[in-house]
UniProtKB/Swiss-Prot annotation:
Any one GO CC term of the record: nucleus
Biased composition (Polar residues): 107-117, 130-139, 151-160
Family as reported in the entry's similarity comment: Belongs to the POU transcription factor family. Class-3 subfamily.
Protein name in UniProt: POU domain, class 3, transcription factor 1
SMART domains assigned: HOX (SM00389), POU (SM00352)
Stretches the record annotates as Disordered: 1-29, 56-139, 151-200
Listed InterPro entries: HD, Homeobox_CS, Homeodomain-like_sf, Lambda_DNA-bd_dom_sf, POU, POU_dom, POU_domain_TF, TF_POU_3
Amino acid sequence: MAATAQYLPRNNSLPSNPLMHPDSDRMHQGTTYREVQKMMHQEYLQGLATNAGHPMSLTHHQWLPNPASDWGSGSHLGAQAEHGKSGVQSSREDLSSSFHHHRSHLVHQQTPSSHAWAQSGGHHLPPMSPGSNSHQPLIYSQSSYTNLNGMLGPQASSLHHSMRDPLHDDPGVLDTHVESPPQHLSHHQDHSDEDAPSSDDLEQFAKQFKQRRIKLGFTQADVGLALGTLYGNVFSQTTICRFEALQLSFKNMCKLKPLLNKWLEETDSTTGSPTNLDKIAAQGRKRKKRTSIEVGVKGALENHFLKCPKPSAHEITSLADSLQLEKEVVRVWFCNRRQKEKRMTPAGVPHPPMEDVYSQAETPPLHHTLQTSVQ
């Protein structure tokens, strides 16, 4: 009875229950074990005060007893208590030497003993706050911190990286796939953009083309015929007119623009030499200016027509020189005047000489009267 008295609680308020719990996994130790735990708690608080670190920075004490060991047996309890007291002194040196070594590995390092403490029944009890000064009579253990170390071990860290990597890496990969189009599509789009002119370019070219065409003296029909001579495809005057007025479709405007541009270049390069001028004239009809004859010049031509309605080439040349007209203008005027006189004379009636008609008439002809009134 005296041998077992040292293992009994000091207060008599505890019920007379056996030290061993019916559950073989959980055991409640005596007062001596609680004194050892209080000493360990004080050492833990001193370690926090000196090192100013987080509770997770302290490594697991290898000298902490395992509840699954022979602590429950009364024959070994005293020896284990004495061994625990001596272990307190040795643990101070172990903590100071191993603190800096395990500081960088506090998350990824895990010892087998921490698993044993994680499986023990001590972590079911509420842990004591490191900052509190009150000493609770409950058993204190570091199982809560070792459980955190176990949770933040290599498996948990790899899980943490696997959860974090899709959030940081995959969006970049997805962005590159979404933002960068396929290469063949981008090349095709660049090629089409370079070939097709814009609407502003077409409008500017149509305006410049019309101005240069008029300056060179070509009609729209002349340009259409010239394109047929150069490229084998004759365009109508309506097509050239609609191009200048921007009334063609965008596709047809783009097709016709290079042809007209090349025609302008050919025309500019061939302007000046007589042989090339003949070549340009063969490509299309050149615009002819309408000749306006003055009233005095027209009266002189009428007098010469009354004398000789069909003059010779020599007479036409001398008359053109005297009136300062072109030979072709004088010739065309006499042709038109004869056609007019033929329309005025009825068919089947013999045509008297023009001089006899004008001399026998009491009044001058009608065209003479009109010409005199105008003068």
